Swiss-Prot record:
Gene3D superfamilies: 3.40.50.880. This is Putative glutamine amidotransferase-like protein RP404. The keyword Transferase applies. Keywords: Glutamine amidotransferase, Transferase.
Length: 281
């Protein structure tokens, strides 16, 4: 058993270099919260560069993997045949690299935590599909204000009470919701409730607290669930908030951003669970 397992993290790749830096070369981008969360959980983070010829050696080095979020969508060609090319905003280099990383990691049963876009990619890897734009899929109601107080008592976590205001808008779409899944800034604070399924890995990580609050900054979501996956949490409008694999030791995806380590009884515990699982590979 390793004292501090090595957790590989795939970065984003920025190519609009003239706007952001002094040299006209691509650069890797990764919010510090990811590495801070891994360190806080007892792991050592390392960046995984986009060189496919290094993958096999990296897989021998790392003990766990985090696939983080990002601004660009997974290209729909990876999960459906028909799509409008002019509506696609993606980073295919990142898609191809992360798919390769996940394929190798799943073959070796390396523990994986997918976050936001990372969860969506996990679903695609298991032959699932995505809702390409939530506002086209759900119906928001206008001229209403919704407040909810949430409270959960467990042995592990102190009681936390949240008051949640939600401003609602109307759109003509098939599913009703009161949740804005792309919350306004600040995007790190919790904004809506999720309901966790009993007897899942996620419920154990949350110490059997089956409801908590999370942040939300995504416009896509799981549509058709991938093979050998189960849904371990949903938002109150039915949008999938967490998935996990049934035939692997630790493969969990969450739609929110736990790297901000909100005091909600689950964010830090997710990273601790990943690090713990990574000690025993």
């Amino acid at each position: 058993m390793k004292e501090k397992p090595i957790i590989g993290v795939t970065p984003d790749l920025a190519k609009n270099c003239q706007k952001y830096t002094y040299a006209d070369f691509p650069w890797y981008a990764l919010r510090r919260n990811y590495t801070d969360a891994i360190i806080a959980a007892g792991g050592i983070p390392i960046l995984l560069p986009y060189q496919s010829d290094t993958i096999n050696q990296l897989m021998e080095l790392i003990d766990g993997i985090v696939i983080p979020g990002g601004d660009e969508d997974i290209h729909p060609k990876f999960y459906e045949q028909k799509y409008a090319e002019d509506l696609v905003i993606s980073n295919e280099e990142r898609d191809h690299f992360e798919i390769l990383v996940l394929k190798k990691a799943l073959e070796k049963d390396i523990p994986i935590l997918g976050i936001c876009r990372g969860m969506q990619l996990l679903n695609v890897m298991f032959n699932g599909t995505l809702i390409k734009h939530i506002p086209d899929y759900i119906r928001h109601f206008s001229k209403l204000t919704y407040s909810k107080k949430f409270e959960c008592n467990t042995e592990a976590f102190a009681t936390t009470v949240y008051t949640l205001p939600i401003k609602l808008e109307f759109e003509n779409a098939p599913i009703k919701t009161i949740i804005n899944h792309t919350q306004p800034k600040p995007k790190n604070i919790v904004s809506h409730t999720i309901n966790i399924e009993v007897s899942t890995k996620l419920s154990k990580i949350a110490n059997n607290c089956l409801q908590t609050m999370v942040n939300s900054t995504h416009h896509q979501a799981v549509n058709k669930l991938g093979n050998d996956l189960i849904i371990s949490a949903k938002a109150e409008d039915g949008i999938v908030e967490a998935i996990e694999a049934t035939k692997h030791k630790f493969v969990i995806g969450v739609q929110w951003h736990p790297e901000y380590l909100n005091d909600n009884g689950i964010d830090l515990q997710l990273f601790k669970a990943l690090v713990k699982a990574s000690k025993y590979i």
